[in-house]
Regions:
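N-terminal first-folded block
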Residues: 44-46
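Intrinsically disordered, low-complexity, compositionally biased regions/tails
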Residues: 19, 140-142
Length: 146
């Protein structure tokens, strides 16, 4: 009987991990499909806790190498169970180059295109509005060569 309970617990835990992985892959596939007629290159999966009041919102940071004279598309999707809306920002050092949320207008966009002018390391930051908790995925896609 004890062995049966242990085996049942192991299968239950393994099954929940498989379902979670399946949800992330479905969200990634859906987000990549929403990017349009582009070539998928990379995904950025995030799960962030809620931020503290008055503090900086939790942010995931990813470094990537982009090539000169290439147009990239950066897309963002939030999981349905997320409290917050995901925002993707692209930086070169401290310079904001693109964002899926325009603070001045309060408008969200599902993606933005970036025309890379120089080969180098860039950083993708993903956070959730108002520091809320959430899960999401960012997608980097190839659009065309200039």
């Amino acid at each position: 009987m004890k062995r049966f309970i242990i085996i049942f617990a192991v299968f239950t835990f393994a099954g929940s991990a498989f379902i979670k992985a399946q949800d992330v892959s479905q969200l990634t596939a859906q987000c990549a499909a929403n990017a349009g007629d582009v070539m998928y290159l990379k995904d950025f999966v995030v799960k962030l806790d809620q931020g503290t009041p008055g503090g900086a919102p939790p942010t995931a940071r990813f470094a990537l190498l982009l090539s000169k004279n290439v147009v990239y598309r950066f897309s963002i999707c939030s999981a349905p169970n997320s409290d917050g809306e995901a925002v993707l920002q692209l930086f070169d050092m401290n310079t904001l180059l693109g964002s899926t949320f325009i603070t001045a207008t309060g408008k969200d966009y599902p993606f933005f295109d970036f025309k890379c002018q120089k080969t180098g390391v860039y950083h993708v930051f993903i956070s959730f509005k108002e520091g809320k908790a959430g899960e999401g995925v960012g997608i980097m896609s190839y659009v065309k060569k200039l």
